Structures are given as structure tokens and as C-alpha cells.
């Protein structure tokens, strides 16, 4: 799996990087929360613009971003407009969605920006190009809150995101069985092993899929979302537990690699 480095944070290398969401409504609470999050053991903070009091008004969204960037200090800022179609709070027409993306990009404040695979449609490559011009890396996302598509479909979708120029393909799906969780993990491993051109972010949602949020270093998911007190998706694990488990698994991976090197040297 390849690696991208933003603000000194190497995504796709070592321990999965941790993202926590801001889902407050008022600007004052958004900035308060950002200041609190800036002191936590996390790599990135996601602003869910669709939860904002006035997300449709560029004159309200744009001024908030520079203040948010300052409040977060050196944490990566991921900006996300989660549409109703993808499980979010905001029903937008296509032009409204792309205009809001450009409003965010024009501020030059986002380190990463989420662009939804299906809502972007044929405009996806151009939107990704615009994001890169603005200096933002692209998380290209697809969500299914009802089911888990077959592994081949998940892989096909993430490869299409890569081909469109995305820096971090992301899929989040809902399992109906333990086999569904394995399907997501298998798709993740296939991407890491056979399509390593970019890191990927994957998760199986709900309590049943929680293991997928913790086992990224083993299976190939480069980032994970944690719950700092308010979850933004089903099955997000609390931040303390995420950090504890990621640290433990990272240590085991390091021990395993060292053991392999010792055996090879005999």
C-alpha cells in the first residue's frame, strides 16, 4: 500500500490514522469543539458541514473554515458534505453539491476533502482536479447503509475512484451477517495487495462491523473514524478504545515483523 504525507502525517504507513468528527450546528460550538479536539491523540478532525446551521449559504460556510483551521493547530482538517443520498443530513441537487465543494476549496483551508463517488457522477475527475489545484487531497467516498455489496463490486468501485484521481478511496457498508464483515475485509486486503497505488479507507458499520474499524493495519485500511463523544456513523468506537486497540495491534505487527526477520537471518 502506498502512502501520502500531509502536514507530516503519513497516511498508509504504520498505525491507521484516527479521525474524529465535529457534528455541532453553531459556529461557536464548532470552534469550541475544534479547540478541544486539537489536544487529543488523533491525526485528523472531520468537519461535517451537513450538520452546520446554514450549510447551503457560502457566505456562512466559507468564513468558518479559516477559524476552524486555526483552532485545530496541526491536526489534519477533513471537510465533508454528507448528502442525504449517502446517509447525511443534507439533500442537495447536483449543482448545489458541486458549488458547495468549490466554496470549501476556494478557502484553501481543507487538507482533505470528501467527494462522494455517486453524487459527483461524471464530474468526479474534474472535481478531484479542482481539489488538487487547491492543495487538498481527496477522500472519494461511497456509503451503503443497507447492505454489503460483493467483494468484487467493492474492489471495482475503489479502483474506479483511483482511476478518477482520488488520493484515498473510501467505502463504508452495512453488514447483515458475519460473512458480510469478512467480505469487506477481503476487499480491503485485495486493494492493499493488488491495487496499492493509493491507501484506502474501509469500514463495516454497526456493532457487527466494529472489528473492521480496529484491524486496518492488518487488512489494509489506512484511516479509521472514532467516537469522541458524538458519533457520526453507526458503530463508531470510542476514541480511548480505538487508540488502545490500535496501539496493541501495532505493537504485535512490529513484533511479528521482527520475528520474521530473525527467522530469515538464520
Question: Where are the regions that the model predicts?
Answer:
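Active-site beta->alpha loop and helix N-cap motifs at the rims of alpha/beta catalytic domains
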Residues: 3, 14-133, 137, 142-150
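Catalytic alpha/beta core domains of metabolic enzymes, predominantly
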Residues: 112, 117-259
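Short boundary motifs at domain starts and secondary-structure transition points
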Residues: 7-13, 249-253
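Short beta-strand/loop segment at the start of cytosolic alpha/beta domains
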Residues: 1-7
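Single conserved hydrophobic/aromatic residue that forms the stacking wall/gate
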Residues: 258, 262-266
Amino acid at each position: 500500500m502506498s502512502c501520502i504525507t500531509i502536514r507530516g502525517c503519513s497516511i498508509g504507513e504504520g498505525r491507521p490514522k484516527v479521525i474524529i468528527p465535529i457534528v455541532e450546528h453553531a459556529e461557536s460550538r464548532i470552534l469550541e469543539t475544534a479547540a478541544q479536539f486539537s489536544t487529543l491523540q488523533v491525526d485528523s478532525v472531520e468537519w461535517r458541514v451537513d450538520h452546520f446551521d446554514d450549510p447551503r449559504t457560502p457566505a456562512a460556510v466559507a468564513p468558518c473554515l479559516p477559524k476552524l483551521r486555526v483552532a485545530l493547530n496541526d491536526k489534519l482538517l477533513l471537510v465533508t458534505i454528507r448528502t442525504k443520498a449517502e446517509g447525511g443530513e443534507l439533500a442537495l441537487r447536483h449543482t448545489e453539491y458541486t458549488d458547495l465543494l468549490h466554496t470549501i476549496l476556494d478557502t484553501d483551508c481543507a487538507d482533505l476533502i470528501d467527494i462522494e463517488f455517486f453524487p459527483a457522477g461524471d464530474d468526479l475527475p474534474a472535481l478531484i482536479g479542482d481539489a488538487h489545484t487547491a492543495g487538498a487531497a481527496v477522500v472519494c467516498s461511497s456509503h451503503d447503509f443497507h447492505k454489503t455489496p460483493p467483494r468484487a463490486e467493492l474492489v471495482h468501485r475503489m479502483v474506479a475512484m483511483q482511476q478518477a484521481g482520488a488520493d484515498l478511496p473510501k467505502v463504508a457498508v452495512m453488514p447483515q451477517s458475519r460473512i458480510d464483515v469478512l467480505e469487506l475485509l477481503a476487499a480491503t486486503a485485495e486493494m492493499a495487495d493488488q491495487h496499492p497505488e493509493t491507501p484506502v479507507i474501509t469500514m463495516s458499520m454497526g456493532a457487527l462491523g466494529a472489528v473492521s474499524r480496529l484491524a486496518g493495519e492488518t487488512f489494509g485500511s489506512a484511516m479509521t473514524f472514532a467516537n469522541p463523544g458524538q458519533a457520526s456513523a453507526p458503530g463508531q468506537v470510542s476514541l480511548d478504545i480505538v487508540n488502545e486497540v490500535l496501539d496493541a495491534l501495532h505493537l504485535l505487527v512490529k513484533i511479528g515483523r521482527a520475528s520474521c526477520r530473525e527467522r530469515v537471518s538464520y
